[in-house]
């Protein structure tokens, strides 16, 4: 469960290391984001000479959350960290590589490019 002021690790090679959530997209009163939801964030930590700089406002899709999520078959999935992948306005990832596993919920939300780049889908 990601909300405003949550910090997330960036799981791609855009050069950003950490982002701060400033808005959860999808409705005026929407409070929380889970795996597969889109957020607006600002870059808090970035590598020097990268494509994104500290302070840039970016869109990202959440790929891992510490809060467990119940699946339709009754199982639960949770990860060790909160992580996101930076995306363009069309929904395509800005980076060319994804690090770490991603949730299967991304397939339901039609983020096929992220699914294909990810080393593991849980």
From Swiss-Prot:
Part of the 50S ribosomal subunit. Forms a cluster with proteins L3 and L19. In the 70S ribosome, L14 and L19 interact and together make contacts with the 16S rRNA in bridges B5 and B8. Binds to 23S rRNA. Forms part of two intersubunit bridges in the 70S ribosome. The keyword RNA-binding applies. GO terms for molecular function: large ribosomal subunit rRNA binding; structural constituent of ribosome. This is Large ribosomal subunit protein uL14. It comes from Parafrankia sp. (strain EAN1pec). The keyword Repeat does not apply. Belongs to the universal ribosomal protein uL14 family. Keywords: Ribonucleoprotein, Ribosomal protein, RNA-binding, rRNA-binding. Gene3D superfamilies: Ribosomal protein L14. GO terms for cellular component: cytosolic large ribosomal subunit. GO terms for biological process: translation.
């Amino acid at each position: 469960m990601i909300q405003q002021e949550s910090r997330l690790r960036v799981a791609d090679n855009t050069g950003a290391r950490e982002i701060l959530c400033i808005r959860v997209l999808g409705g005026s009163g929407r409070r929380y984001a889970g795996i597969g939801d889109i957020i607006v964030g600002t870059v808090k930590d970035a590598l020097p000479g990268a494509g994104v700089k500290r302070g840039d406002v970016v869109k990202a899709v959440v790929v891992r959350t510490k809060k467990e999520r119940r699946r339709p078959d009754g199982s639960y999935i949770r990860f060790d960290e909160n992580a996101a992948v930076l995306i363009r306005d069309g929904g395509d990832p800005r980076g060319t590589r994804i690090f770490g596993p991603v949730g299967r919920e991304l397939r339901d939300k039609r983020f096929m490019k992220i699914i294909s780049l990810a080393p593991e889908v849980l």
